[in-house]
Amino acid sequence: MDFTFTEEQETIAEIARQLFEHRATPEHLTEVEAGAVRYDAALWRELATADLLGIALPENVGGSEHGFLELALLLAEVGWSVAPVPVYATLLLGADTIARHGDEGQRQRYLPDVVTGSRLLTAGLAEPRRSDPTVPATTARRDRDSWRIDGSKEMVPAAQVAHTMLVPAVDDDGVGVFMVDLNADGVELRPVTTTNGEPHADVFLNGAVVSGRDQLNGNGAEMIESLHARALVGLCAIQLGVTERALRIAAAYTTEREQFGRPIGSFQAVQQRMADAFIDVEAIRWTMWQAAWLLGHGRRASREAGIAKFWAGEAGARITATAQQVHGGIGIDTTYPLFRYFLWAKHNELTLGSASAQLARLGAAY
């Protein structure tokens, strides 16, 4: 298992960071957040122009034919800049799943528009009162050459701006994954307020009709398990960027801020907190990259994904709390950039199961 990045992978991360730091400045984020939806369509188009939207997609749909590791690098950069773009929803939950499990017709219908930035995707994994996303309560019943989908999905990322949602549902053969037009009859979106301000909605499906050609073929249970594992690792990649940047901001502040005639970073109590936070960032980093490496090499990694998500949640909360506390009062000032990182870390901690939920799931597997 080699975690050394290639020159091409480092270039992808560098291009993404430069683009996000140029466009997603604190001042610009404040402007975006004052609007109806925290989504920057112009930045999304710039990602398309930079060939970043197709990094993990096949060449025959306009992609760069890279893989999951490159996608994780891009997600980490989203977290570093808390960028207002649906990379996680569109590229990981949606496009990556269609690229791996869709037939050629499905890939050609959906993925070229993703690469150009004109189609946004998402997937609904979480359901009300259900703790295991791999066992959906949503149902799909056959209606001649189509399917009718009934059920609900909660906290669907980017649902307000997405065109299509992937829906795991129980069907005649067990479980399947269906591509649902979010503007179709029988689909109702109810936007929800989130901790980090990112667009999410509860989606209600009341007999929503899906064409037979919009069901992904293959073993549905394996598809959903794989999607869930990749979704967890994607969140961990974002969390790595979030916590690494929060620690960097805190390190700079403790170097510059003086008290009693010297930088507060010279005090032992502050040094200990910062050292513990550094160790926590490294725990998130290496558990995430272990799981991402396995997934990127076509291996199952549900256990490793759960371990990584545990660390992303547990350690992420400690890191951002430390970053705020060494700042004092300015750490929670909404005109200072750190507050966004605390909110993003909390959102990532709880999405698709907290640290305790990951431990419970890991324990139940033995």
Regions found by a protein language model. Name each.
Residues 2-8, 12-14, 52, 80, ...:
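Glycine-rich beta->alpha junctions and the first turn(s) of the following alpha-helix
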Residues 27-35, 251, 255-262, 278-311, ...:
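C-terminal helix-coil-helix/basic helical segment that borders enzyme active sites and/or dimer interfaces
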Residues 65-74, 132-136, 180, 209-210, ...:
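Structural signature of FAD isoalloxazine-binding scaffolds in flavoprotein oxidoreductases
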Residues 117-128:
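A short, Trp-centered hydrophobic/proline-enriched beta-strand micro-motif
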Residues 124, 150-187:
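A short core secondary-structure module
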